[in-house]
Every structure is written in structure tokens, then in C-alpha cells.
Swiss-Prot record:
Gene3D superfamilies: 6.10.140.2220. This is MYND-type zinc finger protein samB. The gene is samB. Residues 222-232 have a biased composition (Basic and acidic residues). PROSITE patterns: ZF_MYND_1 (PS01360), ZF_MYND_2 (PS50865).
Length: 603
């Protein structure tokens, strides 16, 4: 039997691969993971920059091969994860940057079931995390109210600087009520020990001792944050916050007029501390290696599971769009002309600025206690990006990077280094599962979709769902059995260990009874990130488009109805947004449960 991996002996190549200057369809049929990853890595660049490559992939079976790689399912092997992510990136590039005919071929290649499975998995994981987080929050809340309140003089009554910054950012970025306070031990233990032995020397006739510049800066930042926080407006706290850090030194000999003092452990280099030598490893700042933490937040080293590699996302070398519709790429072209400090994805629709939004969402937002800073809002959320910024992930650019790092106690030099190094995006729900070190939790963590996977799925849907002739593919789809995470979620619920993989049902025997629009509509709820809300709203607005091929009629916006107009303007529009149409009042009332999240007033 002939080997499927083609080789080129005359150029000393063990297998055919795709480069940035050469596309070879045979490279996608390689069964070896490493050369296939190399080819997919270069293909991700070609699909971004070359319209001809995108057109070739639609006629030579390249898209079908990429979809087959995606339908093979995820694996906990790092290389297999990388292969799946790169193949997914290639398909998204083809669909987002391609013309109408190219996008049609992406839908016809059965990409919609893959997207539907990704969205469904993410919703299930989110619901599972929130269902398990609610009892935990209530238990911590009852424990917090039961324990006595410490006095102002105790070190435990003073939250750490990181907790203060996080609390201030949460109050400024969110409008719903904050969750109950949870007692978190302070990070900087050595600072509290020093404060307990501090001696106030402000009344001494000697000149006040000075501290190094970086220490003075740190004290000023701490003072600024505490003065803005109403919890620190008490006289006792104000007096302690206004003292420079030099006052927290042990008593010194009065004959020492030069202000010299013994070097403490906190001012030594990490390599000089005997207790940290075993835990320090060098982290090369390479494009493919995530950087280590800039500043240690706790002396105890915690074990973090291996994160999946992200996608190599390349920006387009050509500024022209392959689609004649300039409206589709106006957002992308505008972002490409801006400086690198601006977000790539410009959200033209601001959901929080809609009137009466808070009153409508109180019933939904108050029920969720898994409150973690939004990755697209909180600038302290780190981003996992290997080499290039994505046209999808707008959170890779931090406009307020210097201000945020200063609030966290980092120096400006450290903040500059952070922007040049690849970081990891801490998803709120992945962090929830990561904190639980059980085997079942790690299985869910490795198989659950990442935020960027969901974001790219929604963006791809936003570009392909505006064609009414393809609407049947979205309303009559199915789930891919090998991509579902039901087994991992069941293991997490039961706390059982991995078992033998059961025989999976054949995908092509499944009925096409899945409508993808109700899944997308769930991402318009406010507990998802702003980018997810934006692209989900775009997809839902595309559902309200009129079909010009059928005489300009529209479909009822309630997904369980699906009735079409018999003539133009037969159905009544929503009075608030003037976009959606319903065949009856009953359909409008039934659809209002989720429609209220993307129903925006028109000027």
C-alpha cells in the first residue's frame, strides 16, 4: 500500500509541506502531526494574505480536508491541540476574508456543525461553572458574615494592594451589584510583618530617611489607590497610608547620619534568596514560549496546568477586500489604518449605552455569582498570543496598559516588557475549573472551547449568515459527536476518573434538527464578553434580513416559528429596535426573553 506522506528526496525533504511562498495541496494529507502543523502554520498566513490561495482551497478540496481535521475532535495531546487550532484558524480566515462564493463554499463544506458544537460546548461549560459557583459563593458569604470583623489595627484587616486595584476596577467597569466580599489572605506577607514592627519617625528632628526611587513610587501608588477608596477614609488608615515606606524600617542607630540600613530579604535579587532558588526557572522571551510572571505575587509556587497553544494569526499584507460589499470590511480596514495601540475590532455598537438596559437586565444579571472581570473590559486580563495580533481578538491591545500595571504595583519598565511577551488569557470559567485540581476538572479544562475559539466562530457566522440563500444550513444543522464535551462534564459532575471511550454515534446518521440561532442568541447576555456580545448581535440582525430572491419578504424572528411573509410588510416590526419582525404577539412575547439583550433603540 502506497504511503500517503509524500517525500521529496532531491531537496532533502521527508514530506511535502506548505511554505509562505509555496502552496501544495498534498501537504494537507500528511498523517504525521509535526509536518502538518508546520504546513497549517504557513497556510494560516497564506489564507490571510492571498485571495488566490483562498480561491484555490475552494476548488481543490482543501476546505473539506480542513473541516475533516476539525471533526476528528480534540485531544489532550499538545500537538493535536495545536493542529486543531491552526486548522480552525485557516477556515476562519477563508470565511472572513473570502468573497461571497468562497464563503458559500465554507458553509457547503459542513463547517456549520463544527461551529454549533463549539458554541453548545461553551454554553454547557458556562452553565456548569455557574451552577457549581452559586453554592460556593453562598457558603463563602455565610462564612464571611459568621466570622468576627477584625479591627483596623490588625494586619488581616488591611487588604492587599492587588485586591484594592481589582475591587476598584470591578466597581468602575460593571453596573450590576458586586458579589459578597470573600476573605482573601493578603499577598504581600512581608509587608505586613514590616508594618507590625514599624516605628513612626516623622516627629524626629533628623532629616527623614529616603527609600530607593522604585520603593517611593510603589508607596505613592498605594496611597493614591487608598485615597480613592472610601474604605480607607478613616483617620487610622489615612495616617498609615500617608507614611512613606521608609517609616516601616526597624529602628536604627542615631549615630548613623547617612541613612544606611541593613539589606532586607525583600530587596535582594530572587537568585540570592535560598528559599526561591529551586523554584526559579529561566523563561526565554521567544515568540513561541509564554512568558513567566513578571512579579511574584505569592511566595508559594502554584502548579498551573499546561494551556493549549493559541493560533498563529497573521495580519493581511494586502489592504483590499475580496468582497465587493464594503460594509463587511469597513471595521477591519479602519482598524488596519490605525496605530498599533488601537483595538483591531472596533465595536460600532455599545450595548451598555442603551437606555433602560439596567432595568431590563436586573433579573438576569443578579442571578449569577461567578463574577470575574470581563476579558474584553478589564485591561489586567492577560492575552495568549504567540506572535501576531489577531483581527478577531480585540483584547490583545491594551490602551491603558501603563495605568493598569501601575495600579497593580508594577513599574512602567515592567509594563513595557509585558506588552512584548505572549501572555495567557485567563478565561473566567477555565480559571474556575483550573482551581479545582481534580482529574475530571482538568479534562473539562483541556477539552472546553477557548474564548478565542468562540469569538472566531461568532465572527465567521456574522460574515456567512448574511446570505439568505444559506439560511437553511444554519437552521437545520447538527452537533459533531467527537467534539462534544458531555462525557467530560459528566465526569466532572460525578467526580469519576477517565473511562474507556464509548462507541460514538455516526455523525452522518444524526438528524439535522439543530438551529444555530438560539445558541448564538445566548451570547448576547451581558455575562459574556463585549466582543462575543457584539458578534452575536450581528448574527441575530442578519437573521432579520429580507430575502431579495423571494421578493423582499422577511421571516418571523422567533426561532420556533420560522414563518415567512406572504407579501412585503405583512409582519409587524419591533417598536423598539425596528429590526425584528414577528407574525403574532405570542411570538414576540416568547422571543423577548433573549431578544431584549440585543434590542437596541434606533435614532
Amino acid at each position: 500500500m502506497r504511503e500517503v506522506n509524500f517525500s521529496i528526496p532531491n531537496v532533502n525533504k521527508a514530506s511535502v509541506n506548505i511554505t509562505t511562498t509555496l502552496y501544495d495541496r498534498r501537504a494537507l494529507d500528511c498523517t504525521s502531526t509535526l509536518p502538518l502543523i508546520n504546513s497549517l502554520n504557513h497556510l494560516a498566513y497564506l489564507t490571510t494574505s492571498s485571495a488566490r490561495i483562498r480561491d484555490i482551497l475552494t476548488v481543490d478540496g482543501g476546505i473539506e480536508r480542513l473541516v475533516c481535521i476539525l471533526k476528528e475532535g480534540r485531544s489532550r495531546d499538545l500537538m493535536e491541540m495545536w493542529k486543531w487550532s491552526l486548522a480552525f484558524q485557516c477556515v476562519v480566515n477563508i470565511g472572513v476574508r473570502g468573497s461571497e462564493s468562497v464563503r458559500t463554499r465554507v458553509v457547503e463544506a459542513d463547517m456549520v456543525p463544527v461551529i454549533a458544537t463549539i458554541l453548545d460546548n461553551y454554553i454547557k461549560v458556562v452553565d456548569k461553572a455557574r451552577a457549581r459557583a452559586d453554592p460556593d459563593t453562598q457558603r463563602h458569604s455565610s462564612r464571611h458574615h459568621a466570622k468576627p470583623v477584625p479591627t483596623a489595627g490588625e494586619p488581616s484587616a488591611r487588604p492587599s494592594l492587588l485586591e484594592q486595584a481589582a475591587h476598584t476596577e470591578q466597581r468602575a467597569s460593571r453596573r450590576q451589584a458586586p458579589p459578597p466580599n470573600i476573605e482573601i489572605p493578603p499577598y504581600f506577607q512581608d509587608n505586613h510583618v514590616a508594618d507590625s514592627n514599624a516605628m513612626d519617625i516623622s516627629s524626629s528632628p533628623r532629616a527623614p530617611m529616603t527609600s530607593p526611587p522604585e520603593r517611593s513610587t510603589f508607596g505613592q501608588e498605594a496611597h493614591n489607590h487608598r485615597t480613592h477608596d472610601p474604605r480607607y477614609l478613616h483617620p487610622g488608615h489615612r495616617q498609615r497610608a500617608m507614611q512613606p515606606l521608609a517609616t516601616a524600617l526597624p529602628p536604627m542607630d542615631a549615630a548613623d547620619g547617612f541613612g544606611l540600613r541593613p539589606v532586607r530579604d525583600t530587596e535582594r535579587l530572587p537568585s540570592m534568596l535560598p528559599g526561591l532558588q529551586n523554584g526559579i526557572t529561566s523563561q526565554p522571551d521567544s515568540p513561541t514560549t509564554p512568558s513567566g510572571p513578571i512579579q511574584a505575587r505569592n511566595n508559594a509556587a502554584t502548579t498551573v496546568p499546561v494551556q493549549r497553544p493559541t493560533l498563529r494569526q497573521q495580519r493581511s499584507a494586502s489592504g483590499d477586500s475580496d468582497d465587493g460589499n464594503a460594509e463587511s470590511f469597513s471595521m477591519e480596514d479602519g482598524a488596519r489604518s490605525e496605530a498599533t495601540s488601537e483595538p483591531i475590532v472596533q465595536n460600532q455598537m455599545e450595548i451598555d449605552e442603551v437606555g433602560d438596559r439596567q432595568a431590563m437586565l436586573n433579573g438576569v444579571s443578579d442571578g449569577h455569582d461567578l463574577t470575574v472581570t470581563d476579558p474584553s473590559e478589564g485591561q489586567e486580563a492577560e492575552t495568549f498570543n504567540i506572535t501576531h495580533r489577531s483581527t478577531v481578538d480585540g483584547s490583545t491591545i491594551n490602551n491603558g496598559n501603563t495605568q493598569t500595571n501601575t495600579a497593580l504595583g508594577l513599574s512602567p519598565a515592567q509594563a513595557a516588557n509585558t506588552t512584548n511577551s505572549p501572555n495567557i488569557v485567563p478565561s473566567p470559567y477555565s480559571l474556575y475549573f483550573r482551581d479545582r485540581s481534580a482529574t475530571a476538572s482538568q479534562n473539562v479544562l483541556t477539552t472546553m472551547p477557548r474564548d478565542e475559539d468562540v469569538l472566531m466562530s461568532l465572527q465567521l457566522l456574522a460574515y456567512v449568515s448574511k446570505y439568505c440563500n444559506l439560511r437553511s444550513y444554519f437552521q437545520n444543522s447538527h452537533f459533531v459527536p467527537k467534539l462534544k464535551v458531555d462525557r467530560e462534564l459528566q465526569m466532572f459532575e460525578d467526580g469519576s476518573s477517565p473511562m474507556e471511550t464509548a462507541e460514538e454515534e455516526d455523525e452522518y446518521l444524526l438528524p439535522d434538527d439543530v438551529n444555530i440561532f438560539p445558541l448564538v442568541e445566548k451570547f448576547t447576555v451581558r455575562h459574556h464578553s463585549k466582543d462575543m456580545q457584539y458578534w452575536a448581535c450581528v448574527v441575530m440582525r442578519n437573521l432579520c434580513r429580507k430575502d431579495e430572491s423571494r421578493g423582499g419578504i422577511r421571516q418571523c424572528a422567533y426561532y420556533k416559528c420560522g414563518k415567512w411573509e406572504e407579501f412585503q410588510r405583512q409582519f409587524a416590526k419591533c417598536r423598539r429596535c425596528r429590526r425584528t419582525k414577528y407574525c403574532s404577539k405570542d411570538c414576540q412575547k416568547a422571543a423577548w426573553v433573549y431578544h431584549r439583550h440585543w434590542c437596541h433603540t434606533t435614532p
